[in-house]
Amino acid sequence: MKLADFVTYVFGSLLAGLVTLKVLSSFIPSLLVTLPAKVRLRVNNSLLKCSNNLNRIPVLDFGWKNSSVRRAFILASERPSDYTNKIYGDRVHIAYNDRIKRESFVNKLGFDSKRKLLGFFHPYCNAGGGGEKVLWKAVETSLNQDKNNICVIYTGDTDVNGSDILNSVRRRFEYDLDSDRIVFIFLQKRRLVESKSWPKFTLLGQAYGSIILSIEALTTLAPDYWIDTMGYPFAYPFVSLFARIPIVTYTHYPVISTDMLQKLKTMPGFHTNFKLIGKYVYWKIFMLAYKFSGLFVEIASTNSTWTYNHIKSIWSSTKNIHIIYPPCSTESLIEGCDKSDPVKRLNQAVVIAQFRPEKRHELILSSFSSFIDATTKKDLIPKIIFIGSTRNVEDREYVETLKKYAFEALKIPTHLVDFKTDCKYDDMKSILYSSWFGINAMWNEHFGIAVVEYMASGLIPLCHASAGPLYDIVVPWDSKKNEQSTDKANETGFFFIDETDPDFLAKDSSKYSSLRTLFAQVSKLNTVQRIDISNRAKMCSLSKFSDSEFERSWNEVLEELNLTHNRMFS
């Protein structure tokens, strides 16, 4: 092929791609929301056929228009939650309450509604972790902000129904939500975003999977706003270009960061290892794609200073970036804590973290074992209680591995370590209120909601010196002025580092001790010292990380969204 022919071919392909993109971006939005012809007549006829038996459920199939019909039904319905796709899949049924009020329901179909659909894309909404707490508090705040707001939850938790999920939310987080205005859309292709589905090129595979999953979500029900509370950025161009939906993000941690690139680059033999160089190039290209996805974000919010700095660097073109600390229910935790007597707390430490390797449970166990072997004052040795949720078989197997490591490899006495999986919230609070210390060992924990729960419950946090706990949470606090301080005498907890940290050599080892040394240090604190630190920590957690503070910040996001929406349609 001649050079001129090659150039012509390339430019021709690009032009064809742009034309196709233009056509699709103008056609697909109307496809997702415009109702098929004579839809009211068809719905009315179906309802009339069932008028003699209201228990008979009309189930309609409008083909590729099912998404727009489901949307219209939700906007017109007495109880929007009835229009989940749990039972009938892509087809759309007519709910009992709307069958009773046939004429009113049919007349509302297709007409302008003050209602808005806020689509929360969170494929693991039933996981029960800190990310899910953010999701459900955002949902609660959105519902309370305006009676016309309807929250759509896009989830892959197909083994349960909507009621099961909301009951779990009530038990775990004590959020009592208006279930009538929550619509669950169950996604069948969640496996495509699971790492086990992509043993090679995992990041690329999960990015592709998130695009497919978002398309499944949009073609089932298109919302007015796309709110990603879990972190699937590669879907944004498709949501924005093809559905023309404003995008709001709540980022817990970047998909890929400069820290990851730097860590890879500083590995021994990097410059002569073609495999590492290839991986670096692969990640670098991935970073460029991540930057590109930020172009389509209307409002970005992050959970911490560490995450904010990374996102601001990566999505430099996104102007609206905020820090919104996660809701940590510090109000209720402190209320319960104040009812307990600190003098009666037990000499025990709590570790609240999902049972995953990156939470570094093994580091805690090995450090604890070393402390036990080294100390001569055996009466000062605390008990450690590990509390965490298990998402799947892999997590449960990991717990068994930890038990073997603790009791067989390290020979830690069984009465000094306890594992509690999928613990009820009330049980967890009881353990917190009766303990003195809380441990968080994860390196570069983007936020650390468990650390806040420690502080609000009156525990003294022992945290790895990085990211959220270091920059945002365990900060000196002036109890007289009730504000953040620079005086180390106002400490609210303690930090440690470990030689297994990726950035260990860059840290000042004289400034931070090891966890083993920290165990010895805090075990010597007297009751008065413990109570002073505990009180400062409680004040800090209430001022910075309460549910009411999250509500205030999230309402500001919703107000910005409404302004954007009004500008678009004015």
Swiss-Prot record:
One of its GO terms (cellular component) is endoplasmic reticulum membrane. This is GDP-Man:Man(3)GlcNAc(2)-PP-Dol alpha-1,2-mannosyltransferase. Belongs to the glycosyltransferase group 1 family. It is a single-pass membrane protein. CDD domains: GT4_ALG11-like. Pathway: Protein modification; protein glycosylation. GDP-Man:Man(3)GlcNAc(2)-PP-Dol alpha-1,2-mannosyltransferase that operates in the biosynthetic pathway of dolichol-linked oligosaccharides, the glycan precursors employed in protein asparagine (N)-glycosylation. The assembly of dolichol-linked oligosaccharides begins on the cytosolic side of the endoplasmic reticulum membrane and finishes in its lumen. The sequential addition of sugars to dolichol pyrophosphate produces dolichol-linked oligosaccharides containing fourteen sugars, including two GlcNAcs, nine mannoses and three glucoses. Keywords: Endoplasmic reticulum, Glycosyltransferase, Membrane, Transferase, Transmembrane, Transmembrane helix. It is an enzyme of class 2 (transferase). Pfam families: ALG11_N (PF15924), Glycos_transf_1 (PF00534). GO terms for molecular function: GDP-Man:Man3GlcNAc2-PP-Dol alpha-1,2-mannosyltransferase activity. It catalyses: an alpha-D-Man-(1->3)-[alpha-D-Man-(1->6)]-beta-D-Man-(1->4)-beta-D-GlcNAc-(1->4)-alpha-D-GlcNAc-diphospho-di-trans,poly-cis-dolichol + 2 GDP-alpha-D-mannose = an alpha-D-Man-(1->2)-alpha-D-Man-(1->2)-alpha-D-Man-(1->3)-[alpha-D-Man-(1->6)]-beta-D-Man-(1->4)-beta-D-GlcNAc-(1->4)-alpha-D-GlcNAc-diphospho-di-trans,poly-cis-dolichol + 2 GDP + 2 H(+). InterPro entries: ALG11, ALG11_N, Glyco_trans_1. The lineage of its organism: Eukaryota, Fungi, Dikarya, Ascomycota, Saccharomycotina. It comes from Kluyveromyces lactis (strain ATCC 8585 / CBS 2359 / DSM 70799 / NBRC 1267 / NRRL Y-1140 / WM37) (Yeast).
